Structures are given as structure tokens and as C-alpha cells.
């Protein structure tokens, strides 16, 4: 379980979220860079093209989870299958990295909307808990049923 959490923290680092704690007197303003079913309006490339205007008014941009959701082409990021593959309904990993760099160069940060317990399996035998093994920097990670919250219906129903 520790490896999973360490991996998740690494994922956040990849997205360049590097807060050292939230300052009590923070006066910044955050823009929610997406809305439900806003796939075309919230494409990474489209948000990047608006960086000059957004950077004038906002300090942070809140974006949806960028993890790959398998066969789901229109997914708001709440059914990730692969944590380490950053291709999603909003764009590719390269587009995501380019967008983050553009905003970072203008002094704007990002917050990714990630819920660890929102995870989807690869769909073998129509199961949503057949989580794939993933390898990152030579380390392989594999979630199982024991990694689901103990009061989740899947864990309690066996």
C-alpha cells in the first residue's frame, strides 16, 4: 500500500503540483478549467492557447484527472484505468506537459482533480476491479481488492 501512495505522489509531481502546505494568508485565485462534459472546451491545447489571458487573472488552474480511462473516450477523469498513462479525453500527455510548461512560465500553477478511490479495471469478465499492473521507473505496481476501502461495496460483498 505504501508503494501505491508513493506512486501517486510521484504522479502529482509529474503534474508539477509542488505545494509545501497551503499558506494561511494565500490571496491567489483559482480557475476551474473544466465543467462536466466540457471535452472540447477543456482540451489541453485549447486551455494552453488561452494562457496569456488566464494568467492575467488567475494563479491556479484546476484541471480534471489526466489518467487514461481505457475504452472510455468521454470520461471526466473519474474512471482511470492506468495512473501512469496520461492520455485522456482532454488530450495527450505531450499536450498536458506543454500546457503545464506554458502556464508555469507565466507563474500559474495547477491542481489536478484526483480521487484515489475512483479507479476502474481493464474490464476482464466485466469486472471493474481487475486493475492492471503498471510499471513506472522500473517499479511494478498492482492494486488488488485489498487496496479498496474496507467499507466499499466491492470489498464487503467479496
Predicted regions and their residues:
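Substrate-binding/active-site clefts of carbohydrate-active enzymes
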Residues: 21-52, 56-158
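Bacterial N-terminal signal peptides
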Residues: 6-16
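Positively charged n-region of N-terminal signal peptides that target proteins for export
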Residues: 1-4
Amino acid at each position: 500500500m505504501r508503494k501505491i501512495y508513493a506512486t501517486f505522489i510521484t504522479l502529482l509531481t509529474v503534474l508539477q503540483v509542488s505545494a509545501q502546505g497551503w499558506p494561511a494568508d494565500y490571496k491567489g485565485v483559482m480557475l476551474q478549467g473544466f465543467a462536466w462534459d466540457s471535452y472540447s472546451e477543456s482540451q489541453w491545447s485549447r486551455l494552453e492557447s488561452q494562457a496569456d489571458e488566464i494568467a492575467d487573472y488567475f494563479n491556479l488552474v484546476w484541471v480534471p484527472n489526466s489518467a487514461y480511462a481505457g475504452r472510455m473516450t468521454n470520461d471526466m477523469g473519474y474512471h482511470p484505468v492506468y495512473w501512469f498513462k496520461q492520455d485522456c479525453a482532454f488530450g495527450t500527455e505531450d499536450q498536458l506537459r506543454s500546457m503545464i510548461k506554458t502556464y508555469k512560465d507565466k507563474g500559474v500553477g495547477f491542481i489536478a482533480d484526483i480521487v484515489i478511490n475512483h479507479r476502474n479495471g481493464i474490464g476482464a469478465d466485466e469486472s471493474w476491479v481487475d486493475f492492471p499492473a503498471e510499471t513506472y521507473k522500473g517499479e511494478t505496481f498492482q492494486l488488488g481488492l485489498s487496496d479498496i476501502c474496507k467499507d466499499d461495496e466491492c470489498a464487503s460483498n467479496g
